[in-house]
């Protein structure tokens, strides 16, 4: 690692009136480094980066570039220092071409006229350097979110940026798009760029980061190198308590009756004949690698996918589920994996999202009471129930969707990646909600790709491999090692 930091932020404070969002924060970043910045919502990550990018002016503190003090009061100052911030919400002009967006503010001109042909040539060179699949002449509005993100990165390269800041860049990307972004980030790092990466997704941080710095309550807590990365320590740094405290699994519930019993359920394709049991008051984990068939099995139970064989029992009675409505009528709720595409209505009010599953059953005049009660029970942070769902944080959106199923008075909850895309504080609250529902006798089937979550929350774990249940784990046998052994098809774990 280069001994001279490309960036040092020393004792940075930022006040909004009497409230201090940043309280003497330090951050050091080196050339050719992927540096993750972590912390709960409200920890100060985005505020610190906006100070760096000139969107905010620091109340006090200093910034050094290549070891020399550099005053950043405006975005122009930041650009002159080689700093580019890519926000969560793209800062692009959709009606303009890719080339025009890349060159915006630095257009080639001669005699007062923009040299469009040369602008296209220069923009295409940058696009080709990224390996992007679009052209400089394409309109930005025709591109996918991932491609628009590449345009933002291309603009940074066009400006000869040396420090690239990305704020939650994978929030709206598919797994394939995320993989491509990671490949690009690693390539840029190898070319000498310093990349600051704001994320709360542990898997991404482990895959990308050379170092991780953590903020909590507007203060710098510390940094860990790649060699010292540890999920438990990161969580402790972010929330001030150990990872084990997040799960709070001490439910002490006696063995309940078989609430959900699935026998040899299959769709003849993605899901081979699969059986599992979830008892009243228990949380059962469903683990496996991406593509193993976990989500598809949950969709079969909920009636989203058509079963070609097998049987489902609810409270000991055989049931036939052809549709989600039939599942809901049986007291089954389903939190989908992708809340923004399959579950959440972003333009609708929080109250309408919460009562979506109960409107056919309850009078509309009851909706306000139902939503108000759910907001209090799940501690959803909204100014009022009519606020637009799309304006809420990821954690509050997820709690809102969980509350939709709490509102139906469920017997069974199917939760597919219940804490995906939320910060550690929101995770802790979702775990609290799950434990409370289990104490009330709800049977919960939880799909998760986060092994600490599976181990920490589950009373029993089923592991899927290539569309089939590869094994079942109980008690002390629920370990990350045993789960991965089953998930990868090496079937020597003991249940």
Curated annotation (Swiss-Prot):
PANTHER family: CARBOHYDRATE TRANSPORT ATP-BINDING PROTEIN MG119-RELATED, D-ALLOSE IMPORT ATP-BINDING PROTEIN ALSA-RELATED
Compartment(s) where it occurs, according to its Swiss-Prot or TrEMBL record: Cell inner membrane
Keyword annotations: ATP-binding, Cell inner membrane, Cell membrane, Membrane, Nucleotide-binding, Repeat, Sugar transport, Translocase, Transport
Record-stated family: Belongs to the ABC transporter superfamily. Ribose importer (TC 3.A.1.2.1) family.
E.C. numbers: 7.5.2.7
Membrane topology: Peripheral membrane protein
Organism taxonomic ancestry: Bacteria, Pseudomonadati, Pseudomonadota, Gammaproteobacteria, Enterobacterales
Complex and partners: The complex is composed of an ATP-binding protein (RbsA), two transmembrane proteins (RbsC) and a solute-binding protein (RbsB).
Record-annotated ABC transporter domain positions: 7-242, 250-491
Catalyzed reactions per annotation: D-ribose(out) + ATP + H2O = D-ribose(in) + ADP + phosphate + H(+)
Lineage: superkingdom: Bacteria
Protein name: Ribose import ATP-binding protein RbsA
